[in-house]
A protein has these predicted regions:
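Conserved beta-hairpin
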Residues: 61-105
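Acidic, Ser/Thr-rich low-complexity segments on the non-lumenal side of membrane proteins
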Residues: 86-130
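Generic detection of short hydrophobic beta-strand segments and adjacent strand-loop junctions
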Residues: 2-7, 96-98, 139-141
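Hydrophobic beta-strand residues in large extracellular and virion-surface proteins
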Residues: 80-82, 87-89, 128-132, 141, ...
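N-terminal membrane-targeting/pre-transmembrane regions
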Residues: 1-46, 188-195, 199, 205-208, ...
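Terminal and domain-flanking low-complexity segments
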Residues: 1, 131-219
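Canonical hydrophobic alpha-helical transmembrane segment
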Residues: 23-27, 46-64
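Glycine-rich, flexible loop segments associated with nucleotide phosphate handling
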Residues: 50, 76, 117-130, 172-173, ...
Length: 219
């Protein structure tokens, strides 16, 4: 069995990383103030601003280090388990299992990340998403891919190109089909995020079990 950890950048982790940054700013500022007092004298006027700006920037490596440690030590509790003929989404309190030997409906789509100010996912990256439905069971999985990763993925698997309403360009395989808009809302509400490499493993697993998975973005 292969287990793919989901939602590694969960809300609790991001809050903890932000808190570590704030603590780092405070500690660096106080240490800087102590050193300044010993070397120059009391911190006044522009010195306060200089120390504050320096503390903000110097605390960023501390926050990144803390986030890296938390990624290892604090999983979200969600994971995708890949077994021969099966796919399981393990939640904190329950699990959802799909039998890949039976009929599974799926929809695959992607869209470009645009107009973001800061954040973990840069503008120009892509969200690649997949919704699997079997009876009353549904699973939404996704990953954020760089442009190079996106090109490599669509070379193997076609994805519906979900476009903004203001985008007038015509796409051979894309637009704003209602079923994909609905699937995107479900992804936003309850989807599980995977790392790009794990998303590739997921696609390969499904391609090995579902007929025509590599040929069409939906079934």
């Amino acid at each position: 069995m292969t287990e793919l950890h989901a939602d590694r950048y969960h809300g609790g982790l991001r809050i903890a990383a932000l808190a570590s940054w704030a603590v780092g700013v405070a500690i660096i500022y106080l240490l800087g103030q102590l050193i300044w007092n010993l070397v120059v004298g009391p911190v006044v006027g522009s010195g306060i601003l200089v120390l504050g700006v320096a503390a903000v920037f110097l605390a960023q490596p501390l926050a990144l280090w803390a986030e890296k440690q938390l990624l290892t030590l604090w999983p979200s509790g969600r994971a995708v388990q890949l077994e021969t003929g099966k796919l399981t989404l393990r939640e904190k309190s329950a699990s959802v299992r799909l039998d890949l030997g039976q009929k599974v409906n799926y929809w695959r789509w992607r869209f470009e990340v645009r107009n973001r100010r800061g954040g973990r996912v840069p503008n120009g990256h892509f969200c690649f998403a997949l919704r699997l439905v079997q009876g009353d069971t549904a699973v939404s999985l996704y990953a954020f891919l760089s442009p190079d990763q996106a090109r490599a993925t669509v070379a193997r698997y076609p994805f519906y190109d979900l476009r903004p309403s203001a985008d007038k360009n015509k796409a051979t395989l894309g637009g704003r089909d209602a079923i994909y808009l609905s699937a995107e809302r479900e992804r936003w509400d309850s989807g599980a995020e995977l790392d790009p490499s794990d998303f590739g493993r997921l696609l390969a697993h499904l391609g090995a079990h579902l007929p025509d998975f590599s040929a069409s973005p939906n079934s």
